[in-house]
Regions:
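Non-heme Fe(II) oxygenase metal-center motifs and adjacent flexible, charged/small-residue loops
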Residues: 1-220
Length: 220
């Protein structure tokens, strides 16, 4: 397990954790057949001219990804949980609770959403912070990796009370930037003030094997 805890202003902390072999091949197999039948929707770059990955948004209360956004896109419309996903979410929640994150002052939420991303060759996710308008200022985020490995990078940015947009990189603390390799069946976790002071990105895939990620959060 990798754990990176970074002290932040106002006595807060950004918490990052990586746990390899968090789920088993057998547990993944229960999902794979269903995942293979999902009709994923393309996600594009900022100019909506190039596909950068494919996705499907699931929310147990049928909520749009972020109702406070000005523009609406089909890819962020809610889909109903299927049985295998609901069972998998329960499994993930129970297993996370075994790691005693409460000792770090972090509680495991009752997840109510899952964003499933599919990455093909040359796909990626650009640097971003998960919007506080949908998930609050200090969300607990758990990302499961299935299939091809990937590299995730975290970069320090300035925070001015909200995390709209990318903001400017914190050049005085760039030395804190770091990256992790995400192996199949692993989970990476972001919590505390991580979505205030850090962007994260999944770098461009350079192989032809498909990668699937499932990101669990509690939408407010």
């Amino acid at each position: 397990m990798l754990l990176n805890i970074i002290g932040e202003p106002k006595d807060t902390e950004s918490v990052f954790c990586y746990i390899p072999n968090f789920i088993t091949d057998k547990e993944v197999e229960k999902l794979k057949t269903t995942l293979s039948h999902i009709e994923f929707i393309p996600n594009y770059n900022y100019t909506e001219t190039k596909i950068i990955r494919y996705q499907k948004w699931y929310q147990q209360d049928n909520k749009y990804f972020c109702n406070k956004w000005g523009n609406k896109y089909k890819r962020w419309e809610s889909n109903e949980y299927f049985t295998e996903l609901e069972n998998f979410q329960k499994l993930i929640t129970a297993r996370l609770k075994q790691y005693n994150f409460e000792k770090l002052g972090i509680n495991i939420p009752d997840f109510n959403s899952c964003l499933i991303n599919k990455y093909l060759e040359n796909n990626y996710i650009r640097p971003h912070r998960d919007t506080d308008k949908a998930f609050g200022k200090e969300p607990f985020i758990a990302g499961i990796s299935i299939g091809s490995p990937a590299k995730i990078s975290f970069k320090r940015v300035l925070y001015k009370g909200h995390n709209k947009g990318l903001s400017k990189q914190d050049k005085k603390k760039y030395f804190l930037n770091f990256s992790w390799n995400l192996e199949p069946n692993s989970v990476f976790i972001m919590a505390g003030s991580s979505q205030k002071y850090w962007t994260h990105e999944v770098e461009k895939k350079n192989n032809k094997d498909t990668r699937i990620s499932l990101t669990f959060r509690k939408q407010i």
